[in-house]
Amino acid sequence: MPLRVLYILFLLIVSSDLIIAQQVSGKHYKINKYRTVYLPMGKISFADKLVEYNVGNPAPAKRNRDSTQCLHEPNYVDYTTPNYISLGCGGTLTLEFTNNGFMNLKGDDLYIFEVAPSRESMRIEISANGIDWIYTGKISGGTSSIDLNDFNIDNDTVFYFVRITDLKDTCNGKSSGADIDAVGAINSVIKLSIDANVLFDVAKAELIEDAKYTLDSIATSIYQIDKATLMVEGHTDSDGTNEYNEHLSKLRCSAVVDYMKIVLADNGSYDYDIIAFGENKPIAPNDTDDNKQLNRRVEITVIPPKDYFESLHRKN
């Protein structure tokens, strides 16, 4: 199981009571006096960890360099209150989403909460691993939303990192460079991958007894969102025929969905989509026993609810 998945599961298990107490749904966030932006997954949708902050030159005043002020939900009050971070002229800011990610889905995917009277231009890059970066354009003049589809980003990759670079529009004043209050994922997602051996016996589609502990832990992560769509994807190795593997993965997905419907029944409103890939989306060559084990998995991706995307269609 990938390290990120283990880390997320650990956080969810040790903090289950807190998560349940903080159940949220979609929320409107104020942009200015007249406008808001809607984030369908609410307060979990924000970057919450500083990776790197390189102050530009000239640098902003020291009071405008508190890197914690760009994490979590936006809290901007006015320009005289330093509850945002200034990059300085040419400065860079790299942030991470640790308990969720974002991906290219319908509509805008990312929103940069830039504040202050003047809105500087910024270069935006995203990464799935914090190493390989993809350019996703620049924002300026108060236009702070990004649609990854405009940059031919695939629809499968979940991204966890955002890097912002000030483009040196304004290089004077106490808050020189772009001023960032928060970075939010409009199309926020939670993706978890589960080793099929943890859930099923070999070539079987009935959940083993211990599988329920794993799925209960995953349900805990979903408690913080009371309305969403769960995409459940089944994957196998290449042993057997393609038809057999697709059928097996479909049955396994159905078993997972049936159990999740029970444990989430009193929590909120959820839709479920089953996608049986069989052997068609391996993450490793099926040439060793270890690699085949990696390919035998069930993936659960929590995305915004269907009625959110339907509302985008109505607007268009």
Across the structure, where does each feature detected by a protein language model lie?
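Periplasmic peptidoglycan-binding/tethering modules of Gram-negative envelope proteins
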Residues: 184-229, 265-266, 302-316
